[in-house]
């Protein structure tokens, strides 16, 4: 019950930021909440489970809308380049036994993704990469690594994306990337942008990382 109460309070604090200009701290908290939901959805799709106390309370209102859009755009991206987001650890030639190895690899790919600027397409790719790694971790009996990945995602957002997000009014700006004509959500111009971006991301995966 205490975990549920704290989760409800935490969710309320996150949602409060959607009603005004969010601070960097709030943007990071929202990024991590979205990361947990995105990863959880991808794990469920893979027939896997993961325990996260922060998920005890349902994702509220606008945050749920943002998450739904990220997941839908992620679906589109994965259809365009399915091999890029599967078996991520194997593509990066890394072991999942060491947290520094996993987080360093994620940050290396994230750095390449955003080396030429920031777009919503690249943000979706960031979440897809994190989820792909999370699936690998759980499959290899390393569920604790998922928490580390979510924290790492939040730190990357703080250092690299927070200013960009704040200028756009926060995470809800991604809702402009789709035209919602029905519950299925029809993708807008972002999908075309994701298609051209796929080749760049594919190349990023094959950058040699330092040997461990």
UniProtKB/Swiss-Prot annotation:
Pfam families: Bcl-2. BH4 domain mediates interaction with ITPR1. The chain crosses the membrane at residues 189-209. A motif (BH4) lies at residues 32-44. This is Bcl-2-related ovarian killer protein. Signal peptide: none annotated. The modification Phosphoserine is found at residue 7. One of its GO terms (biological process) is apoptotic process. Expressed mainly in oocytes; weak expression in granulosa cells of the developing follicles. In adult human ovaries, expressed in granulosa cells at all follicular stages, but expression in primordial/primary follicles granulosa cell is stronger than in secondary and antral follicles. Monomer; positively regulates apoptotic process. Homodimer. Heterodimer. Oligomer; promoted by apoptotic stimuli and BH3-only proteins; mediates constitutive activation. Interacts (via BH4 domain) with ITPR1; enhances BOK expression and stabilization; limits apoptosis and prevents ubiquitination and then degradation; protects ITPR1 from proteolysis by CASP3 during apoptosis. Interacts with ITPR2 and ITPR3; binds most strongly to ITPR2, and barely to ITPR3; regulates their expression. Interacts with XPO1; translocates to the cytoplasm. Interacts with BNIP3; promotes oligomerization. Belongs to the Bcl-2 family. One of its GO terms (cellular component) is mitochondrial inner membrane. Induction: Up-regulated by DNA damage. There is a cross-link at residues 25, 32, 159, 176 (Glycyl lysine isopeptide (Lys-Gly) (interchain with G-Cter in ubiquitin)). Ubiquitinated by AMFR/gp78 E3 ubiquitin ligase complex; mediates degradation by ubiquitin-proteasome pathway in a VCP/p97-dependent manner; prevents from pro-apoptotic activity; promotes degradation of newly synthesized proteins that are not ITPR1 associated. Residues 15-45 are annotated as: Interactions with ITPR1. InterPro entries: Bcl-2-like_sf, Bcl-2_BH1-3, Bcl-2_fam, Bcl2-like. Keywords: Apoptosis, Cytoplasm, Endoplasmic reticulum, Endosome, Golgi apparatus, Isopeptide bond, Membrane, Mitochondrion, Mitochondrion inner membrane, Mitochondrion outer membrane, Nucleus, Phosphoprotein, Transmembrane, Transmembrane helix, Ubl conjugation. A motif (BH1) lies at residues 112-131.
């Amino acid at each position: 019950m205490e975990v549920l109460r704290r989760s409800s309070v935490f969710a309320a604090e996150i949602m409060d930021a959607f009603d005004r200009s969010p601070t960097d701290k709030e943007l990071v908290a929202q990024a991590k909440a979205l990361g947990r939901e995105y990863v959880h959805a991808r794990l469920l799709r893979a027939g896997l489970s993961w325990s996260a106390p922060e998920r005890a309370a349902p994702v509220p209102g606008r945050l749920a809308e943002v998450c739904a859009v990220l997941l839908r755009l992620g679906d589109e991206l994965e259809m365009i380049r399915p091999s890029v987001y599967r078996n991520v650890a194997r593509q990066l030639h890394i072991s999942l036994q060491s947290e520094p190895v996993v987080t360093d690899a994620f940050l290396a790919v994230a750095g390449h993704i955003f080396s030429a600027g920031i777009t919503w397409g690249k943000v979706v790719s960031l979440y897809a990469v994190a989820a792909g790694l999370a699936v690998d971790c759980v499959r290899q009996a390393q569920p604790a690594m998922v928490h580390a990945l979510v924290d790492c995602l939040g730190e990357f957002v703080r250092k690299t994306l927070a200013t960009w997000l704040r200028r756009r009014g926060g995470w809800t700006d991604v809702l402009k990337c789709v035209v919602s004509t029905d519950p299925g959500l029809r993708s807008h111009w972002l999908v075309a942008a994701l298609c051209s971006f796929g080749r760049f991301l594919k190349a990023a995966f094959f950058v040699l990382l330092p040997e461990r």
